[in-house]
Protein backbone atom coordinates (compact mmCIF):
# COMPACT_ATOMS: atom_id res chain seq x y z
CA UNK A 1 0.00 0.00 0.00
CA UNK A 2 2.86 2.40 0.81
CA UNK A 3 4.36 1.82 -2.63
CA UNK A 4 0.99 2.53 -4.23
CA UNK A 5 0.58 5.70 -2.14
CA UNK A 6 3.96 7.14 -3.12
CA UNK A 7 3.44 6.18 -6.75
CA UNK A 8 0.13 8.03 -6.75
CA UNK A 9 1.74 11.03 -5.05
CA UNK A 10 4.45 11.14 -7.70
CA UNK A 11 1.85 10.84 -10.42
CA UNK A 12 -0.16 13.76 -9.03
CA UNK A 13 2.97 15.85 -8.57
CA UNK A 14 3.92 15.30 -12.18
CA UNK A 15 0.54 16.26 -13.62
CA UNK A 16 1.33 19.95 -13.63
CA UNK A 17 4.45 19.32 -15.66
CA UNK A 18 2.51 17.23 -18.17
CA UNK A 19 -0.18 19.85 -18.62
CA UNK A 20 2.36 22.70 -18.77
CA UNK A 21 5.48 21.35 -20.49
CA UNK A 22 6.95 24.83 -20.82
CA UNK A 23 6.62 25.56 -17.11
CA UNK A 24 7.99 22.07 -16.40
CA UNK A 25 11.29 23.03 -18.08
CA UNK A 26 11.83 25.87 -15.61
CA UNK A 27 10.65 23.80 -12.65
CA UNK A 28 13.09 21.03 -13.55
CA UNK A 29 15.95 23.48 -14.00
CA UNK A 30 15.25 25.17 -10.68
CA UNK A 31 14.76 21.87 -8.83
CA UNK A 32 18.01 20.35 -10.16
CA UNK A 33 20.01 23.41 -9.14
CA UNK A 34 18.46 23.33 -5.67
CA UNK A 35 19.29 19.62 -5.39
CA UNK A 36 22.94 20.22 -6.27
CA UNK A 37 23.16 23.13 -3.83
CA UNK A 38 21.40 20.98 -1.21
CA UNK A 39 18.82 23.67 -0.43
CA UNK A 40 15.01 23.69 -0.69
CA UNK A 41 13.63 24.89 -4.04
CA UNK A 42 11.62 28.11 -4.04
CA UNK A 43 7.86 27.88 -4.39
CA UNK A 44 6.40 29.87 -7.25
CA UNK A 45 2.73 30.17 -8.08
CA UNK A 46 1.49 30.44 -11.64
CA UNK A 47 1.61 33.99 -13.00
CA UNK A 48 -1.58 36.04 -13.07
CA UNK A 49 -3.80 35.71 -16.12
CA UNK A 50 -3.47 38.40 -18.77
CA UNK A 51 -6.53 40.62 -18.87
CA UNK A 52 -7.53 43.89 -20.53
CA UNK A 53 -9.83 46.72 -19.39
CA UNK A 54 -13.57 46.22 -19.55
CA UNK A 55 -15.10 46.69 -22.99
CA UNK A 56 -17.26 49.56 -21.73
CA UNK A 57 -14.13 51.56 -20.91
CA UNK A 58 -12.85 51.24 -24.48
CA UNK A 59 -15.86 51.06 -26.81
CA UNK A 60 -16.84 54.21 -28.70
CA UNK A 61 -20.35 54.47 -30.12
CA UNK A 62 -20.76 56.18 -33.48
CA UNK A 63 -23.97 57.75 -34.85
CA UNK A 64 -25.65 55.88 -37.69
CA UNK A 65 -26.11 57.60 -41.03
CA UNK A 66 -29.69 58.67 -41.65
CA UNK A 67 -31.12 58.08 -45.12
CA UNK A 68 -32.75 61.55 -45.22
CA UNK A 69 -31.61 63.33 -48.38
CA UNK A 70 -30.06 60.13 -49.71
CA UNK A 71 -33.37 58.95 -51.14
CA UNK A 72 -32.61 60.26 -54.61
CA UNK A 73 -32.22 58.54 -57.94
CA UNK A 74 -28.53 59.42 -58.31
CA UNK A 75 -27.65 58.05 -54.89
CA UNK A 76 -29.50 54.85 -55.67
CA UNK A 77 -27.55 54.61 -58.92
CA UNK A 78 -24.15 55.00 -57.28
CA UNK A 79 -24.99 52.32 -54.72
CA UNK A 80 -25.00 54.47 -51.61
CA UNK A 81 -28.69 54.18 -50.76
CA UNK A 82 -28.72 50.38 -50.84
CA UNK A 83 -25.45 50.14 -48.88
CA UNK A 84 -26.73 52.32 -46.03
CA UNK A 85 -30.18 50.72 -46.06
CA UNK A 86 -28.54 47.30 -45.66
CA UNK A 87 -26.41 48.57 -42.77
CA UNK A 88 -29.50 50.01 -41.05
CA UNK A 89 -31.42 46.76 -41.37
CA UNK A 90 -31.82 44.44 -38.37
CA UNK A 91 -28.98 42.23 -39.64
CA UNK A 92 -26.68 45.17 -40.31
CA UNK A 93 -27.21 46.63 -36.85
CA UNK A 94 -25.72 43.57 -35.13
CA UNK A 95 -22.53 43.37 -37.17
CA UNK A 96 -19.41 42.65 -35.13
CA UNK A 97 -16.55 45.20 -35.34
CA UNK A 98 -14.66 43.22 -38.03
CA UNK A 99 -17.67 43.19 -40.37
CA UNK A 100 -18.34 46.82 -39.47
CA UNK A 101 -14.78 47.78 -40.47
CA UNK A 102 -15.31 46.16 -43.87
CA UNK A 103 -18.53 48.16 -44.17
CA UNK A 104 -16.70 51.41 -43.33
CA UNK A 105 -14.10 50.90 -46.06
CA UNK A 106 -16.83 49.99 -48.56
CA UNK A 107 -18.78 53.09 -47.53
CA UNK A 108 -15.76 55.36 -48.04
CA UNK A 109 -15.13 53.87 -51.47
CA UNK A 110 -18.81 54.24 -52.38
CA UNK A 111 -18.99 57.84 -51.17
CA UNK A 112 -15.87 58.67 -53.15
CA UNK A 113 -17.37 57.06 -56.26
CA UNK A 114 -20.64 58.99 -55.87
CA UNK A 115 -18.77 62.29 -55.49
CA UNK A 116 -16.40 61.77 -58.41
CA UNK A 117 -18.36 59.74 -60.96
CA UNK A 118 -22.03 60.83 -60.74
CA UNK A 119 -23.78 64.15 -61.43
CA UNK A 120 -25.18 65.42 -58.13
CA UNK A 121 -27.31 68.35 -57.08
CA UNK A 122 -25.76 71.00 -54.85
CA UNK A 123 -27.63 69.66 -51.79
CA UNK A 124 -26.56 66.09 -52.54
CA UNK A 125 -22.93 67.07 -53.03
CA UNK A 126 -22.91 69.13 -49.82
CA UNK A 127 -24.49 66.28 -47.85
CA UNK A 128 -22.17 63.62 -49.25
CA UNK A 129 -19.05 65.75 -48.82
CA UNK A 130 -19.95 66.27 -45.16
CA UNK A 131 -20.59 62.54 -44.68
CA UNK A 132 -17.35 61.67 -46.47
CA UNK A 133 -15.37 63.94 -44.12
CA UNK A 134 -17.13 62.52 -41.07
CA UNK A 135 -16.48 58.92 -42.06
CA UNK A 136 -12.76 59.59 -42.54
CA UNK A 137 -12.66 61.25 -39.11
CA UNK A 138 -14.48 58.28 -37.57
CA UNK A 139 -12.25 55.61 -39.16
CA UNK A 140 -9.74 55.46 -36.23
CA UNK A 141 -12.68 54.96 -33.86
CA UNK A 142 -13.91 51.96 -35.84
CA UNK A 143 -10.35 50.61 -35.88
CA UNK A 144 -10.13 51.03 -32.09
CA UNK A 145 -13.39 49.12 -31.71
CA UNK A 146 -11.87 46.25 -33.70
CA UNK A 147 -8.52 46.29 -31.90
CA UNK A 148 -9.73 46.83 -28.34
CA UNK A 149 -13.38 45.80 -28.01
CA UNK A 150 -14.14 43.04 -30.52
CA UNK A 151 -14.56 39.59 -28.97
CA UNK A 152 -11.98 38.33 -31.45
CA UNK A 153 -9.25 40.69 -30.31
CA UNK A 154 -10.15 40.45 -26.64
CA UNK A 155 -9.51 36.71 -26.91
CA UNK A 156 -6.28 37.36 -28.80
CA UNK A 157 -4.97 39.74 -26.14
CA UNK A 158 -5.84 37.66 -23.05
CA UNK A 159 -4.48 34.32 -21.84
CA UNK A 160 -3.57 32.24 -18.81
CA UNK A 161 -1.29 29.65 -20.41
CA UNK A 162 2.27 29.40 -21.70
CA UNK A 163 3.32 29.88 -25.32
CA UNK A 164 3.75 26.50 -26.99
CA UNK A 165 6.34 25.75 -29.65
CA UNK A 166 3.41 24.37 -31.63
CA UNK A 167 2.30 27.99 -32.12
CA UNK A 168 5.03 28.63 -34.69
CA UNK A 169 2.66 28.26 -37.63
CA UNK A 170 0.35 30.97 -36.21
CA UNK A 171 2.94 33.72 -35.87
CA UNK A 172 3.06 34.93 -39.48
CA UNK A 173 -0.73 35.15 -39.74
CA UNK A 174 -1.14 37.10 -36.50
CA UNK A 175 1.75 39.40 -37.40
CA UNK A 176 0.18 40.04 -40.81
CA UNK A 177 -3.13 40.98 -39.19
CA UNK A 178 -1.49 43.52 -36.88
CA UNK A 179 0.45 44.90 -39.84
CA UNK A 180 -2.79 45.34 -41.81
CA UNK A 181 -4.47 47.12 -38.88
CA UNK A 182 -1.45 49.36 -38.40
CA UNK A 183 -1.50 50.27 -42.10
CA UNK A 184 -5.17 51.23 -41.77
CA UNK A 185 -4.40 53.55 -38.86
CA UNK A 186 -1.68 55.19 -40.95
CA UNK A 187 -3.90 55.69 -44.02
CA UNK A 188 -3.78 59.42 -44.91
CA UNK A 189 -7.15 61.11 -44.76
CA UNK A 190 -9.05 61.07 -48.08
CA UNK A 191 -6.36 58.97 -49.82
CA UNK A 192 -8.81 56.36 -51.07
CA UNK A 193 -6.13 54.33 -52.85
CA UNK A 194 -4.56 53.45 -49.48
CA UNK A 195 -7.68 51.73 -48.19
CA UNK A 196 -7.39 47.92 -48.25
CA UNK A 197 -8.92 46.02 -51.14
CA UNK A 198 -9.31 42.89 -48.99
CA UNK A 199 -11.81 41.96 -46.29
CA UNK A 200 -10.66 42.16 -42.66
CA UNK A 201 -13.09 39.38 -41.80
CA UNK A 202 -10.63 36.92 -43.39
CA UNK A 203 -8.30 37.48 -40.41
CA UNK A 204 -10.96 37.04 -37.78
CA UNK A 205 -11.05 33.28 -37.18
CA UNK A 206 -7.30 32.77 -36.78
CA UNK A 207 -7.01 35.77 -34.47
CA UNK A 208 -9.87 34.53 -32.32
CA UNK A 209 -8.62 31.00 -31.73
CA UNK A 210 -4.88 31.51 -31.26
CA UNK A 211 -4.58 33.93 -28.27
CA UNK A 212 -0.97 34.31 -29.42
CA UNK A 213 -0.31 37.82 -28.12
CA UNK A 214 -1.88 36.98 -24.77
CA UNK A 215 0.18 33.80 -24.45
CA UNK A 216 3.38 35.65 -25.33
CA UNK A 217 2.58 38.23 -22.64
CA UNK A 218 1.78 35.53 -20.05
CA UNK A 219 4.98 33.66 -20.92
CA UNK A 220 7.12 36.80 -20.67
CA UNK A 221 5.82 37.32 -17.13
CA UNK A 222 6.16 33.66 -16.17
CA UNK A 223 9.67 33.31 -17.57
CA UNK A 224 10.79 36.48 -15.81
CA UNK A 225 9.50 35.14 -12.49
CA UNK A 226 11.20 31.76 -12.89
CA UNK A 227 14.52 33.27 -13.99
CA UNK A 228 14.39 35.78 -11.13
CA UNK A 229 13.71 33.19 -8.44
CA UNK A 230 16.36 30.85 -9.89
CA UNK A 231 19.00 33.57 -10.12
CA UNK A 232 18.33 34.52 -6.49
CA UNK A 233 18.64 30.87 -5.46
CA UNK A 234 22.08 30.74 -7.08
CA UNK A 235 23.24 34.13 -5.78
CA UNK A 236 22.20 33.45 -2.19
CA UNK A 237 24.04 30.11 -2.18
CA UNK A 238 27.09 30.89 -4.29
CA UNK A 239 29.37 30.66 -1.23
CA UNK A 240 28.55 26.95 -1.20
CA UNK A 241 30.04 26.58 -4.68
CA UNK A 242 33.67 25.53 -4.27
CA UNK A 243 36.13 25.63 -7.16
CA UNK A 244 39.82 26.20 -7.82
CA UNK A 245 43.00 24.20 -7.57
CA UNK A 246 43.25 21.52 -4.91
CA UNK A 247 39.56 21.94 -4.04
CA UNK A 248 36.72 19.44 -4.30
CA UNK A 249 34.90 20.73 -7.37
CA UNK A 250 32.28 17.98 -7.45
CA UNK A 251 29.40 20.35 -6.73
CA UNK A 252 30.58 22.86 -9.34
CA UNK A 253 30.85 20.11 -11.94
CA UNK A 254 27.30 19.01 -11.12
CA UNK A 255 26.08 22.61 -11.47
CA UNK A 256 27.85 22.95 -14.78
CA UNK A 257 26.21 19.75 -15.95
CA UNK A 258 22.77 21.12 -15.03
CA UNK A 259 23.61 24.32 -16.88
CA UNK A 260 24.71 22.41 -19.99
CA UNK A 261 22.01 19.74 -20.04
CA UNK A 262 19.00 21.85 -19.05
CA UNK A 263 19.72 25.55 -19.48
CA UNK A 264 21.64 25.32 -22.74
CA UNK A 265 19.64 22.44 -24.20
CA UNK A 266 16.11 23.35 -23.04
CA UNK A 267 15.71 26.69 -21.26
CA UNK A 268 17.79 28.88 -23.56
CA UNK A 269 16.16 27.66 -26.82
CA UNK A 270 12.71 28.27 -25.35
CA UNK A 271 13.69 31.76 -24.18
CA UNK A 272 14.99 32.50 -27.69
CA UNK A 273 11.70 31.25 -29.19
CA UNK A 274 9.63 33.46 -26.89
CA UNK A 275 11.80 36.49 -27.64
CA UNK A 276 11.66 35.84 -31.39
CA UNK A 277 7.88 35.49 -31.28
CA UNK A 278 7.54 38.76 -29.42
CA UNK A 279 9.81 40.53 -31.91
CA UNK A 280 7.60 39.36 -34.77
CA UNK A 281 4.55 40.75 -32.94
CA UNK A 282 6.31 43.92 -31.82
CA UNK A 283 4.44 46.22 -34.22
CA UNK A 284 1.17 44.87 -32.86
CA UNK A 285 2.35 45.36 -29.27
CA UNK A 286 3.27 48.98 -29.96
CA UNK A 287 -0.07 49.60 -31.69
CA UNK A 288 -2.05 48.14 -28.79
CA UNK A 289 -0.14 50.17 -26.21
CA UNK A 290 -0.57 53.40 -28.19
CA UNK A 291 -4.31 52.97 -28.70
CA UNK A 292 -4.89 51.87 -25.08
CA UNK A 293 -2.99 54.92 -23.84
CA UNK A 294 -5.34 57.22 -25.78
CA UNK A 295 -8.17 55.73 -23.68
CA UNK A 296 -6.25 56.30 -20.45
CA UNK A 297 -5.53 52.57 -20.13
CA UNK A 298 -2.47 50.33 -20.43
CA UNK A 299 -1.80 46.81 -21.73
CA UNK A 300 1.75 46.30 -20.43
CA UNK A 301 3.30 43.78 -22.82
CA UNK A 302 6.19 46.08 -23.81
CA UNK A 303 7.23 46.52 -20.17
CA UNK A 304 6.85 42.77 -19.68
CA UNK A 305 9.29 42.16 -22.54
CA UNK A 306 11.77 44.65 -21.09
CA UNK A 307 11.56 42.83 -17.74
CA UNK A 308 12.01 39.49 -19.52
CA UNK A 309 15.21 40.72 -21.18
CA UNK A 310 16.48 42.14 -17.89
CA UNK A 311 15.89 38.91 -15.93
CA UNK A 312 17.44 36.84 -18.72
CA UNK A 313 20.55 39.03 -18.71
CA UNK A 314 20.83 38.90 -14.91
CA UNK A 315 20.69 35.11 -15.00
CA UNK A 316 23.29 34.91 -17.74
CA UNK A 317 25.60 37.29 -15.89
CA UNK A 318 25.52 35.06 -12.81
CA UNK A 319 26.74 32.09 -14.84
CA UNK A 320 29.38 34.18 -16.59
CA UNK A 321 30.65 35.40 -13.23
CA UNK A 322 30.69 31.90 -11.76
CA UNK A 323 32.51 30.42 -14.75
CA UNK A 324 35.07 33.20 -14.64
CA UNK A 325 35.66 32.62 -10.92
CA UNK A 326 36.06 28.90 -11.49
CA UNK A 327 38.36 29.25 -14.49
CA UNK A 328 36.00 27.99 -17.18
CA UNK A 329 36.88 29.29 -20.64
CA UNK A 330 34.64 32.25 -21.51
CA UNK A 331 33.68 30.66 -24.83
CA UNK A 332 31.86 27.95 -22.87
CA UNK A 333 29.84 30.41 -20.78
CA UNK A 334 26.31 31.43 -21.71
CA UNK A 335 25.47 34.43 -23.84
CA UNK A 336 22.41 36.65 -23.49
What are these regions (language model features)?
Residues 12-14:
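C-terminal motif of bacterial Sec signal peptides marking the signal peptidase cleavage site
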